[in-house]
Amino acid sequence: MAEAFTTVPAKSSPARFRYTKANPVKDPTTSFAGKTILITGPNAGLGFEAATKFARLGASKLIFGVRSLERGQEAKTKIEQLTKCKRDAIQLVQLDMGSYASIEKFAKSVTDEFPVIHAAVLNAGVAPPSYKLSQEGWEMSLQVNVISTAYLAILLLPKLRESGRAIGEPAYLEFVSSTGHGDVTTESVRDGKSILKKVNDPANFKFTAQYQITKLLEIWAMEHIAAKTSPKEVIVNSACPGLCKSSIGRDFGIVLRGLDAVFKGIFAQTAEAGSRILVSAVTAGTDSHGGFWALDAVSVPGELVTSDEGKALSKQFWAEVLDVLRKQNADVEAILNG
């Protein structure tokens, strides 16, 4: 039955939600003994549940990229209590995905401090209910979910490539995506001048659509980064946990939070069930390189990922992202190209 959803273009639907809730993927059992796993956004929801699984499966080191060290410490303590992992297994490194300077500092810190990184799970994401600019001048979800995630991924590539060569098997770079990317229409992103400016325009902001758009752009970014990366060194993929009861709606108002709770009460699986995909994605193998991992299978992404029109838009988008990042870091393309 899963093939009914993995072999056709990804798209949200009640049928897909019901199937995923009723048929959660198997809980991963692969050992991560001796491995170092980096995960952003591990304080709550999917990130917390995935981090807990990595700890239970024996990861020697867990690097937590956290905006709040206080909240990171709370998550660390709770995971230590739940899994009985060693007290020095989890290390907190501050990371504000709304700040290029913080991203650069984080990437340098983990590159310098850890001999190898076996997998990086880029889970941090936001879904603000109203328009808000980041300090870098972009709408917050566009900043965090897309531009900053792409920048962090690129800055981590040298360490991941080096790690893959050192351990004799590919490291992993995982983007956390959403089936909702398949719901995005061409009109939502196509613009005669600039895709980023269109998505950044407050006049176009609708919070549900905006989150889905950022997840489409994130998949486009993943594909371009994967195209510049050998899967013999780093497997780059995108993982969709499915609709989950997670903390992504933490900034919603009372009414919206109530509606969200009712909808997810009917259709959503638990964050624990969804987090299984985040863990299995870093064992998915070379077939998942540049791919969309959902329901524990390499799946067909949305039409704006696979169609000729989507590929043309993706190419334009990526050129714009590199233009933005080049202004922050003149070496960004050299780093990406390895």
Curated annotation (Swiss-Prot):
The active site is at 177 (proton donor), 211 (proton acceptor), 215 (lowers pka of active site tyr). Pfam families: adh_short. InterPro entries: NAD(P)-bd_dom_sf, SDR_fam. Pathway: Mycotoxin biosynthesis. It is an enzyme of class 1 (oxidoreductase). NADP(+) binds at residues 46, 71, 96, 123, 211, 215. Keywords: NADP, Oxidoreductase, Virulence. GO terms for molecular function: oxidoreductase activity. Its EC number is 1.1.1.-. Belongs to the short-chain dehydrogenases/reductases (SDR) family. This is Short-chain dehydrogenase/reductase phmF. It comes from Phaeosphaeria nodorum (strain SN15 / ATCC MYA-4574 / FGSC 10173).
